[in-house]
A protein has these predicted regions:
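Small-residue-biased structural context
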Residues: 1-238
Length: 238
């Protein structure tokens, strides 16, 4: 049995848990998080801005998946491989394994409730994402994409982006908020300190700044850096 694929029952439970968690948080009267002294980044803000970097990689994946679907393989495959390398190092080995899986998820499971019931689904999605990352890295290792590989690679990129967009949206709006509300002010401060230590041990400095800089370079190489290119086209008159 594929351990990375949630069962239908798990998916049903997850769907109910997402809805119930949203209701629970909407009615929760927990204290609002105080700003860190000196303008320091809180643990939740740190997690969410890291998601911002990862979402920029998802944009790269969606755009290149569209090119592949159109039969185009003449773009910089090495840059796509670098995006997957960055997702592995920053998203999976650091953000997921060291922060979410070591700190956030155990606290959610300890607190119990509907959000805790969704943790197995989040973990399964982490595992599936690592499979996707390995596939992308392998297909881009030579610096070019073989035309025969284009359909499968495009599907993996598209499916991964779809999954991770839902995954990060749930974490940002439900899981991280439940995690924050499950802790005292002192525990939140301690979590922020722990996250900073983990970041320094991994990157010897600002991991977020490093990752944001790298994804900007990847966007430039692929011609995806201009924000205006994503502006929606003209909307027909109603």
């Amino acid at each position: 049995m594929d351990q990375a694929r949630p069962s239908r029952r798990a998916a049903f439970v997850a769907a109910g848990g997402v809805f119930a968690a949203g209701l629970a948080l909407a009615g929760c009267g927990g204290k609002p998080e105080q700003k860190s002294p000196g303008g320091e980044v809180s643990a939740v803000e740190d997690l969410m801005r890291e998601h911002g970097v990862l979402r920029r990689i998802l944009i790269v994946y969606r755009e290149t998946a569209g090119w592949l679907a159109a039969g185009r393989t003449d773009f910089d495959a090495a840059a796509l491989g670098q995006a997957a390398d960055l997702f592995r190092a920053f998203g999976e080995d650091y953000h997921e394994r060291e922060l979410e899986e070591q700190h956030v998820f155990p606290q959610l499971q300890k607190a119990g409730g509907p959000v805790a019931a969704v943790v197995p689904v989040l973990l399964a999605q982490h595992a599936r994402g690592r499979q996707a990352t390995a596939f992308v890295r392998a297909r881009c290792a030579s610096g070019r994409i073989a035309p025969a590989d284009a359909p499968a690679l495009g599907k993996v990129l598209q499916d991964f982006a779809r999954m991770y967009e839902a995954h990060t949206a749930f974490e940002d709006t439900v899981a991280f908020q439940a995690w924050r509300q499950s802790m005292s002010d002192k525990e939140r401060e301690t979590a922020g300190d722990q996250f900073e230590k983990v970041e320094r041990s991994h990157f010897a400095g600002g991991g977020f700044e490093m990752a944001a800089g790298q994804v900007a370079q990847i966007e430039q190489k692929l011609g995806l850096a201009d924000l205006a290119r994503y502006t929606a086209g003209a909307v027909p008159a109603p």
